[in-house]
Amino acid sequence: MQFADFVTCGFNQIVNNLAKTHYRWGQNADVVVRMPTGAGTGAGPFHSQSNEAWFFHVP
């Protein structure tokens, strides 16, 4: 993913599909989503979101 800001575009699939795979089919869905996040990426004020809290509260 280019910037963490864009994770919101795929958040429905990540939360509603991947997070519930274990409960629906009894299988793990091991996924790594890599994206630059927070300050220090040199991307300006519009690409410096920190969305980690969303993922910490998803099963």
Describe each model-derived feature in a short phrase.
Residues 1-59:
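Conserved thiamine diphosphate
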